[in-house]
Amino acid sequence: MLPSMAATVRQPSALAARAPPFASARDRRRLSQRSATTSGAASPATPRVGRAGSVAGSQPARAVLDPRDRRGYAPARLSSRPLRAVREPASATPVEPSEPAGDASAKHEGQARGEDFELQRAELARLRPLRDAMLRAGSDLASKEKVIASDPRVAAFLDARGPVARVLPNMGSEEAYLVKCVVAIGQEAVLDSRASDDPIHVSNALRALCATLKHVEAFYDMLGGLVGYQFAALELIHEAFGGPPAATSRDLGADAKSALAGSQTQTVSETTPVTVDMHVPPGPDLREGGGEYARLAASWGLRELPKMAEVYPLGGAGDRLGLEDPKTGESLPAALLNYNGRTLIEGLLRDLTAREWLYYKTFGEHVKTPVAIMTSAAKGNHARISSLIREKDFFGRGESGFRLFEQPLVPVVTVRGGAWVVSEEKEMSVALKPGGHGAIWKLMHDQGVFTWLGAKKRVGATVRQITNPMAGTDTTIFALSGVGARENKAMGFASCERHLGAAEGVNVLVERGPDAAGRYAYGVSNVEYTVLQRHGISDEPVAPGSSEARFPANTNVLYIGLEKIQKALESSPRGAFPGMLVNLSKPVTKDGVKGGRLETSMQNIADALEGFSKPGERLPPSRWGELPTFVLYSSRRRITSSAKKKRDVSKPPSSQNLAQTPDGSFLDLLRNASDLLDKCGVAHPKHDGGDTNAYVDYGPGFIFCADPAIGPLWDVTAQKIRGGKLHDRAEVRLEIAETQWRDVEVSGSLLVTATAPLGGTNGQKVNVFDDTKCGRARLLDVTVRNKGVDWSAKGTQAWSATLTRKECCEVTLRGNAEFDARGVKLEGDVKYDVPAGKRLELFAGPGGPADVIERWSDLASDGKPSWQWRYALGEGGMVELELEEAPATHSATKERASARRDGKENVAPESRVGESSAREKPTGAKPSRSNGFVTRKGSVGKTAAPVNAKAAEKRAPTSR
């Protein structure tokens, strides 16, 4: 979160010293020396560092940008209407909740709120000295035990000699300490033994509780462990009720050092007036400039691929998606959602494999990108994800290619003085939730993930969330990593337009200062949508009458510089717990009491990656592109379209009803397919079948889905696929990488599947790229006509690829099999199953295109294919393709066909479609071995490569 928010906690530099890390002695002294009045009873006159509006009469800075700067990080292009920077509201003084006017229920609610406010204030005053003492105790368990045992509540609890107190001497020292912590923070109700006072029963229940709490104690060590977690959560709750700004962030962070080399963050005095202004962040825009800059930036990313890693936060459960285990009824992880015929996690890994295939085809090397995955203990998430990956043989990437680490669950805290929610079903159990995806950075440090990636010589990584299947589209990921790695950036955000009223966070450029040295801090950051108003960000349109919001959307698609993120963790307290908040929007008990858990935001580690101006100066907008953080803009549907929740079928179809649902996400996938087909020159109907109602009720206007390895860059795809037409409700699925499509017309369903689209595997079921051993298909001047999908069939669901087909044209290529069709019309329900080592050619007989003749032959004994695509990185970052083919292909086939008609060649009998089963494959005559390949260049249709790469970089288009 932004620096002025109480939710930002800075991490002391002790993180580098040990794992798990603890707060430094200096930071612990600062915390313990704070008076009890700072939190819960602060004087209205107490100055607040990091709060905006403290300069009387100051005018907000205007985000005036220089449109003439055209470097790779050129400032944003603004609308003609001047945009002023948003300034955070002044810090609120403690407010005694007044009794609201109104009816009896409102009066009662106001009274209850006032009581909650007083409970919170009293509890904070009680906990502060205990939290401070815990920080002074450091990491030594004996020292912490001594502090906790001296707490009056704990002493009274032990003296009472209840069932729990009696078994503590027989428990481990750490477990006994954690139980005492529960008592010290006022949660004795959790320890009630309702079923039995039997010591064995009580001990077992306590051990189960402690198994969870020890992870909370370890993860929040820098805040004071379990005590610090409770205190920080209660501070934020109290602030939301009108209490003073939470002080934890300032107390921990005042002495932090900047993650930037050579930049020292000096201590800010308590009276230094500090303001926080938020601007629309500038950045290059992949949507503009004819695609030249997008192509160039993507080529940078392609070159940097051997230095990249992938990071996936997969902690979310699929509750809102309605995903359940059919046997147990338990919620399944969102990663297991069957989206377009495969799980979401498989979709992300297919995108990654496609980028690796492009690198292999371009540079001849098989790069194996390491994948780090953050799971959660919630509802068996970790176990299910681990099991899925193993069942899928690690998706052909090998066990050493993955590193899974588990996010801890944290207690839910209510507004009633911070009381935990006690489970009614399980003895000594509390409601637990994941603590937000911001935990990912500290976990990567504590569990050695950064070390693992460093050993693999990785310098950067792209971060994607599991519920967003769209981020791998075209140039997005390549360009983001390319810009980040080439410019040695610390962090980058892929951003896009945000619709007014959308429930999503925004990206901002924060200008904060001055500090004690007179410097201003700058950096791109994120503001969660739940706190937009708190930061003075209203939902204004970018221009009058526009439906696009002024600030761009945060998409959770990130680039990170691994070393810089590590340094931020080790030198800035904000890195460990970025963007802390407690969301109180929902009730957490049966009687409607609200509460939440302490959460952190993954993106807000950017707040620990700031750049600084010179003392006494502000950094001019023309230099904002030099900051360690950046934004890269693209079209929304090229970056994000999430599948987070199930569509409400009781409501009429609308864009709002489809938002964040699998139905809506798949519609965006088809919009992208429509754009791609336009680029390829393939005519097609409207993607939604006419409108949203038609899409929901009758299905999409067409379906076009392809293995991303066909590209994944659209420039590459457009050289393989050119011309043709998809008729209304046509379905095309190309699960193949090596293919050539020229003027293909489809009415119905066309399914082409290669069982080895990228080559083979080794004995350990690990993918081995080999473009001489993959299946390949050519369709030239081919017409496909059949009845296709039965859209009225029960259970039809386009987004999950749950379809019933009346008829289809299906081609299956096993191993290195080849399928070659030219000038034919394939009608009705036809299936071709080509074995490995075989080649099937289809050509027109005497009766015309519908008179389809088959010719089967063996592939060359030396293993060479009859044709293949050659890739090369050309001018301006264009990946250029050339088709190399052996001489004896279609032309030789035509000659043989003519000879057969004249009775001059003795060959195996020809077969026509429908006359031979796919199970019966005539061997035919072996073709002569190729003496070489004939090269034929591909093209990209309407898109041309830039004349000069430097010119493209200088003309880098910008947004906003």
What is each stretch, according to the model?
Residues 63, 78-107, 891-960:
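N-terminal plastid-targeting presequences
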Residues 7, 36-37, 45, 92, ...:
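Intrinsically disordered/low-complexity terminal segments and short unstructured peptides
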Residues 273-312, 320-605:
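Domain-scale recognition of functional cores that engage charged ligands
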